[in-house]
């Protein structure tokens, strides 16, 4: 889930964007995992969902390997709306990689955040 104040924006090319609604310092946690809000799904659970729900969950989750197999995290709030950037201002650990000004779009690198993404491919644009 997002750990900073944000608002949604709109870009003609990207569509929905997540905009910082406060100044964020380099190294601050922009996103965090909170088990009270964020949901974790087992792959077998998702595989048995009806097609419409499975499609939604697969498109809105991040896949992580937890050492005992893959788990899918569905973050609470606007985090799934963050757009990809090969030079993101939020790193794969959820920290600001540089100072971010209020009004600036928050971006992440899908390849580093989701094990389903591979360098040179764009599976998130399905």
What are these regions (language model features)?
Residues 1-126:
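Conserved catalytic SET/PR domain of SAM-dependent protein methyltransferases, capturing the structural core
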């Amino acid at each position: 889930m997002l750990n900073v104040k944000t608002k949604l924006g709109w870009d003609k090319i990207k569509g929905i964007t997540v905009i910082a609604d406060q100044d964020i310092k380099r190294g601050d946690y922009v996103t965090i995992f909170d088990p009270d809000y964020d949901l974790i799904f087992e792959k077998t659970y998702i595989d048995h969902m009806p097609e419409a729900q499975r499609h939604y969950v697969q498109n809105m989750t991040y896949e992580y390997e937890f050492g005992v197999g893959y788990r899918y995290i569905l973050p609470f709030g606007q985090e799934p709306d963050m757009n990809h950037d090969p030079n993101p201002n939020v790193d794969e650990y959820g920290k600001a990689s540089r100072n971010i000004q209020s009004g600036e779009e928050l971006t992440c690198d899908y390849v580093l955040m989701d094990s389903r993404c591979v360098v040179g491919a764009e599976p998130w644009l399905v």
